[in-house]
């Protein structure tokens, strides 16, 4: 390893002629950990946004004609998640690209190892948050599709899953609704909900497509780095278990040592008594 002491220290003399050693603090890792904290906070924000998205999904699905305010709020949340996710991805990419420079530069292997580990952990945390978001979007799509199917049944039109998917992919709900006569209020309400749910799904699929590439890109990285993270976690757990085991063994050793010390003093005392008795017997024998 290269000696970094000359880089970190400098000498100067004060007015009295004494040598003063000035230690220059390495701000590189401080800046890195600050960036790590920013990324972690952004991921936590996405997790919070996803919970709000789920609540709005439930409200929209429970009402035949949900208020426009709720849908606007949902759309704003989706935009915020997308914007935050793109920022996180850009920061993680920048960190990843800096690894090559670090390897060819003057960074220590310890610093580089720390940076790689932090990057891997953040990437996996990010993918987990986006996977939860994707799961919420997929569930909302399926439940919205179920509502469309039920409303079509109300109008007297029975459809299969394949037929529903065909309608959604075409973007034209009129494929199934054009020949339905809205001769009653119930039928008109059903047709309105079919159209509304269809629009919701169209917006949803656009959002899913936009995030798919980013999600897959990060998921692939995490998959390749997953074994390294698992090894780190396994080593940490093993170290923790070893420390606990060492504590127990130390306690046993102390207890055993204490017992052994007591036995030693008992043996010494018994030996002294035996020597005294033998000396007494010899003394009496000689006296006779």
UniProtKB/Swiss-Prot annotation:
InterPro entries: SNARE (IPR010989), STX2_SNARE (IPR028671), Syntaxin (IPR045242), Syntaxin/epimorphin_CS (IPR006012), Syntaxin_N (IPR006011), T_SNARE_dom (IPR000727)
GO cellular component, one term: basolateral plasma membrane
One family name in Pfam for this protein: SNARE
UniProt superkingdom: Eukaryota
GO biological process: acrosome reaction; animal organ morphogenesis; cellular response to oxidative stress; cornified envelope assembly; ectoderm development; exocytosis; intracellular protein transport; signal transduction
Chain segments annotated as transmembrane: 265-288
Subcellular location: Membrane
Cytoplasmic side: 1-264
Keywords recorded for this protein, A-Z: Coiled coil, Membrane, Transmembrane, Transmembrane helix
Membrane topology label: Single-pass type IV membrane protein
GO molecular function annotations of the record: calcium-dependent protein binding; identical protein binding; SNAP receptor activity; SNARE binding; structural molecule activity
Stored SUPFAM superfamilies: t-snare proteins
Coiled coil: 35-101
Family as reported in the entry's similarity comment: Belongs to the syntaxin family.
Cited PANTHER family: SYNTAXIN, SYNTAXIN-2
Known role: Essential for epithelial morphogenesis. May mediate Ca(2+)-regulation of exocytosis acrosomal reaction in sperm.
Quaternary data: Interacts with SYT6 and SYT8; the interaction is Ca(2+)-dependent.
Protein name, per record: Syntaxin-2
């Amino acid at each position: 390893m290269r000696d970094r002491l000359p880089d970190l220290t400098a000498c100067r003399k004060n007015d009295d002629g004494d040598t003063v050693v000035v230690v220059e603090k390495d701000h590189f890792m401080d800046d890195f950990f600050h960036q790590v904290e920013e990324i972690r906070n952004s991921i936590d924000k996405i997790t919070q946004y996803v919970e709000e998205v789920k609540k709005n999904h439930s409200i929209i699905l429970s009402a035949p004609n949900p208020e426009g305010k709720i849908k606007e709020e949902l759309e704003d949340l989706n935009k915020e998640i997308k914007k935050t996710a793109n920022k996180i991805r850009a920061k993680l990419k920048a960190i990843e690209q800096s690894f090559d420079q670090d390897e060819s530069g003057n960074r220590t292997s310890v610093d580089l190892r720390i940076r790689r580990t932090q990057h891997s952990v953040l990437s996996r945390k990010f993918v987990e948050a986006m996977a939860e978001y994707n799961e919420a979007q997929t569930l909302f799509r399926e439940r919205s599709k179920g509502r469309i199917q039920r409303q079509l049944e109300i109008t007297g039109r029975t459809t299969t899953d394949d037929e529903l998917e065909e309608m959604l992919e075409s973007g034209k709900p009129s494929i199934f609704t054009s020949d339905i006569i809205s001769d009653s209020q119930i039928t008109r309400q059903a047709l309105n909900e079919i159209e509304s749910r269809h629009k919701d799904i169209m917006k949803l699929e656009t959002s899913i497509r936009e995030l798919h590439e980013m999600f897959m890109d990060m998921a692939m990285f995490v998959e390749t780095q997953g074994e390294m993270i698992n090894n780190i976690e396994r080593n940490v757990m093993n170290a923790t278990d070893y420390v606990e085991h060492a504590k127990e063994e130390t306690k046993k050793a102390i207890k055993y040592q204490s017992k052994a010390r007591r036995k030693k003093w008992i043996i010494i005392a018994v030996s002294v008594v035996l020597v005294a008795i033998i000396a007494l017997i010899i003394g009496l024998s000689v006296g006779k």
